[in-house]
Amino acid sequence: ILEENNIKFIGASSKHIKMMGDKIQAKKIAKENGLPIIEGSEGGVKDISQAKELCKKIGFPVLIKASGGGGGKGMKIVHEEKDFETLFSTAKSEALKYFGNDEVYIEKFFQNPRHIEVQILSGKNRTVHLHERDCSVQRRHQKLIEETPSPVLNDDIRKDLFERTVKMVSKIGYEGAGTVEFIYEDGKFYFLEMNTRVQV
């Protein structure tokens, strides 16, 4: 409504809010723009046999996640194949209940990763990063402590992370503040999602 009436909203455009609100689409965009993504399904997984084959390929444990999810809702960790069908069904039901869409996707589950976020500000001609925050101390997928700078990143990894994040945000024409989230383990970072606001 604001855009239709030429009123400037302080924040991301409706196009980018929609684009990054769908986590499957966000992963595709990140990959197309040079960010590493977590091994898993290319899109939403509907068929249980297809899902099981994928899990065998990437290996357990896996994480089933709601495409429109957030806050740990519609997200299930599967440690063994025998539990997959039940947890797959539960994740889809939760996704529909909380987000009105039962689409889920599957990713390799990292046992002890760091959760790193990069905040950005972007305008028509320039995107800048506001450095990183380490948000690894969590309870029920909710951050308890934010630490900056992250004690686990060295200068080379930090530089690479910032450059790739800024490049992706610039390429999609994003305007406003945003938070790009990553999983970091064993010296490698992987795109997780982008929030179209400064995440707190």
For the regions a language model picked out, list residue spans one by one.
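N-terminal beta-alpha lobe that positions the nucleotide/phosphoryl donor
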Residues: 1-180, 184-200
